[in-house]
Each structure stands twice: as C-alpha cells, then as structure tokens.
C-alpha cells in the first residue's frame, strides 16, 4: 500500500478546517412579500411553476399534519375533512394575510403557509 506523504495529509486537514470555519452564505427561501412580487411579475408559465411550489409546500405541510392526527398527536392546524388547496388558493391565502398584516410579508413563504393554515383552520379544544 502506498503511503501518503505527511505534507499532503497536513494540507488536506488544513483545507478541511478552513472550509469548516470559513463564513458561508446560505440562500434562504423568499419571504412572502418577495415571493408574491416574483409571482406577480412572472410569465404565465413561470406563474404555473410558482403555483406548483406554493401548492406542494402546502401539500407537504398537510401530509405532516395528517401524520400527527393519525398518531394522535397535537395537529399543526385543524382543517375540515377532505381538505385540499390548489396552488392559486395558497397564493391568495398568503396575499390576503400579507395585505392585512404587513409584518407577515417578511416571513419565509414556507413558514408563512403553515402560519396561514393555522390562522385559517385553528384547533379548538
């Protein structure tokens, strides 16, 4: 077996350490205001993509909520039976809340979908 020179091993460890401690920039998801602005200025085809994104975000949250309900845990929100929203309905739900509460516009859109669902379908015990 070939031995790795100590200098190369030291260089690899140093490079890895630099990568771990160097500041990195992560791209967070759009906030509601930005997402709606991008949606509104998009072409017809791009709007359909955004509607899929918003609808799939809601769908994922709905599946997570279904698991909580099925396992008898506290649900995130309490929708009616056979609940389903389309992408355009999610867009309008976000738009309504953003226009009534300007602070809501600064919330990441994925989290905002959950908050809007909780507001629209609160759990009352």
Report each predicted region and the residues it spans.
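Sec/Tat signal peptide C-region and signal peptidase I cleavage site
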Residues: 21-28
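N-terminal secretory signal peptides that target proteins for export/translocation
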Residues: 1-6
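Short N-proximal segments of mature Sec-exported proteins
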Residues: 29-95
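Bacterial N-terminal signal peptides
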Residues: 10-20
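Short, compact, well-ordered microdomains
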Residues: 92-125
